[in-house]
């Protein structure tokens, strides 16, 4: 069984998957959001394909640790996922993951257009890898 990582935004959802042993995270795709039904179906397809038993979603907290409007949207969508897919969902503090992902892509000398296409997938990888690393401590 594998763990799925999500970076949920208003326009896209970055997706990452763990290896079967749960040691490493790999970005697999970015879903361009269309509707709740479409988004849930796309996530379900990925969960079925990889035999996912747990989902880790990034929770966008403010720098002082409080939850803002974007956090509420993410929590509501995660409740929908839980309802429709019956998969355990864990929340992971995603502060600065997009910043770290962008920095890594800049260091890799990726063009702006390439970075824009994959930043959410890379951020989902950072979220999931952080969670996986916490399990091994």
UniProtKB/Swiss-Prot annotation:
Q: Which GO terms describe its molecular function?
A: nuclease activity
A GO cellular component annotation here is: cytoplasm
- Record keywords, A-Z: Cytoplasm, Hydrolase, Nuclease, Ribosome biogenesis
**Source organism superkingdom:** Bacteria
Compartments, as annotated in UniProt: Cytoplasm
| Record organism | Clostridium botulinum (strain Hall / ATCC 3502 / NCTC 13319 / Type A)
- As recorded in UniProt, its EC number(s) are 3.1.-.-
Per the entry, what this protein does is: Could be a nuclease involved in processing of the 5'-end of pre-16S rRNA.
GO biological process, alphabetically ordered? rRNA 5'-end processing
Please name the SUPFAM superfamilies in this protein's record.
Ribonuclease H-like
Protein name as catalogued: Putative pre-16S rRNA nuclease
List the InterPro entries hit by this protein, alphabetically. Answer: RNaseH-like_sf, YqgF, YqgF/RNaseH-like_dom, YqgF/RNaseH-like_dom_sf
Q: Does the keyword Nuclease apply?
A: yes
For this chain, the family text in UniProt reads: Belongs to the YqgF nuclease family.
**Which enzyme type, at the first EC level?**
hydrolase
């Amino acid at each position: 069984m594998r763990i799925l990582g999500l970076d949920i935004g208003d326009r896209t959802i970055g997706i990452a998957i763990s290896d079967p042993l749960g040691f490493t995270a790999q970005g697999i795709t970015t879903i361009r959001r269309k509707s709740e039904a479409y988004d849930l179906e796309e996530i379900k397809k990925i969960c079925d394909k990889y035999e996912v038993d747990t989902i880790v979603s990034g929770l966008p907290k403010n720098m002082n640790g409080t939850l803002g409007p974007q956090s509420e949207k993410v929590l509501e969508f995660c409740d929908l996922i839980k309802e429709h897919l019956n998969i355990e969902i864990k929340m992971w503090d995603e502060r600065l993951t997009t910043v770290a992902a962008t920095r890594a892509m800049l260091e890799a000398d990726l063009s702006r257009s390439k970075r824009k296409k994959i930043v959410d997938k890379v951020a989902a990888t950072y979220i999931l890898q952080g969670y996986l690393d916490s399990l091994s401590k």
